[in-house]
Amino acid sequence: NNFEKIHLCYGIHKAYEDIKDFKNAFKFLKKGNELLKIETKYEFKNDEKKIQDNINLYKKIKKVQTSGTHRDLIFIVGMPRSGSSLVEQILVSHKKVFGGGEIPYIQEIAQKIINEEKFDASLIDNYRNEYLALIAELNDSSSVFTDKELLNFKCIGLILSLFPNAKIINCTREPVDNCWSIYKNFFPIKTGFVNNF
């Protein structure tokens, strides 16, 4: 099957890279990414639409006055391979911080709100409470919670509307190094944009 071929290509790439045969290493890396690109069916226009939807959502949301929350939340956003795991590890080394990892809740909530016809403060409050209930299932004892879903950068307006006191850490890295690191590592289908060099 295609995924076996993809993993084989990435493995052969790594073997060639280890013996410094970079020409053959890149050949297999490129093939693995091409096969993965077929599986992801990634279309840039779909991301453009999601980003525009989130911009429109924020324009709607910022007009609505809502209550805040007392839960301390830290959202770690950015590109994959930008140092976000290290940032979260450093934060959770503190006894009052719980690392939630990569949680898809915010993007799911954004999509739900985008699909809502009626929009008011109670709706925002409901979704805020839904998110807090979901993370409470993961950990309710730590006073600070981190959410490291990197692609939440698309939803920063929503995050700050739901949680005005939230902290956002945007992880960045030198762009060429970041893109190369992304390209040469296998990523799940949800990050389909990573397979085009």
Q: Where in this protein do the model-derived segments appear?
A:
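Alpha-helical solenoid repeat scaffolds of the TPR/TPR-like class and their adjacent stem/linker regions
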Residues: 1-138
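PAPS-dependent sulfotransferase catalytic domain
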Residues: 97-100, 105-118, 141-197
